[in-house]
Regions:
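Cell-envelope and extracellular/periplasmic
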Residues: 1-259
């Protein structure tokens, strides 16, 4: 493998819908040379062509992990491959992707326990690329998180402040922009009126995410899971088609931002 052009380094961070609960066998194949995963935990001396499940084995005890109770992985298929494929298709910009996600995590937990691990993964990727004379054009974060804050009835103001505080740590590590993927619904189709009431908590977070991107130029609302209620496989997660469509939409917006 030889990379001769400058790359864009992207951290894919958040909770379970960033880690992905789809079906890898249904995900698209990435275009040859379009993107590579830097596995900061499990394979820090190499770049691996992007494929699903993205982030496999990128689990750190006492840090970002996505294990099942018996030690298997919860990562089963994400938005990343579709995103990178579209991003590369637009202008031919190669992506180096870094996994930094953990299911069921709130912004408060991220501030206390996980942002340091995520930033360390970004720093490791930067060092690897520098050591291998691979130039970096831009550093971005794709952030998909918020369901747990909705469950906890976090207010819009606190959610926006926590998210800004977290992304400031990425900014200090060199990130130039955050592309936010808005959360979807609590799947009230499975839970009737109680589910609709619970989904109002998620609407608070969706509104906070819209406001944050409107008010702060460091953030762009790049895609949303909100339209994909009928593609939900359980109370919180989606079939692969939804991850692919959200990833494609996000990749397109990201490249338009660069234009």
């Amino acid at each position: 493998m030889e990379i001769t052009s400058a790359v864009d380094l992207i951290v894919f961070a958040g909770q379970s819908n960033m880690a992905g609960r789809g079906d890898a066998e249904d995900a698209p194949e990435c275009l040859p040379g379009a993107g590579y995963e830097y596995k900061a935990v499990s394979a820090p001396e190499d770049l691996i062509p992007i494929q699903e499940p993205f982030g496999l084995h990128e689990d750190r005890a006492n840090g970002l992990s996505d294990w099942t109770e018996d030690g298997g992985t919860k990562r089963s298929g994400s938005m990343v491959t579709a995103l990178v494929k579209e991003y590369y298709r637009q202008r031919g910009h190669v992506v180096i992707g870094v996994s930094a996600s953990k299911g069921g995590t709130s912004t408060e937990q991220w501030k206390k326990s996980y942002i340091s691990d995520a930033v360390s993964r970004l720093e490791s990727a930067k060092c690897y690329l520098s050591d291998h004379q691979i130039a970096v054009r831009d550093i971005y974060v794709v952030w998909c998180q918020g369901e747990t804050d909705g469950d906890h009835q976090v207010t819009k103001e606190i959610y926006k402040k926590n998210t800004q505080d977290l992304m400031e740590q990425f900014k200090k590590a060199g990130a130039s922009h955050v592309f936010l993927v808005q959360i979807g619904h609590f799947n009230y189709l499975l839970h009737g009126e109680k589910g609709k009431a619970w989904d109002k908590r998620y609407e608070v977070i969706r509104q906070a995410q819209k406001e944050l991107c409107r008010e702060n130029g460091f953030f762009t609302l790049a895609a949303s899971f909100e339209p994909y209620l009928t593609l939900m496989r359980d109370s919180y997660h989606y079939f692969q088609q939804a991850y692919d469509e959200v990833g494609t939409a996000c990749g397109k917006i990201m490249e338009e931002y660069k234009a």
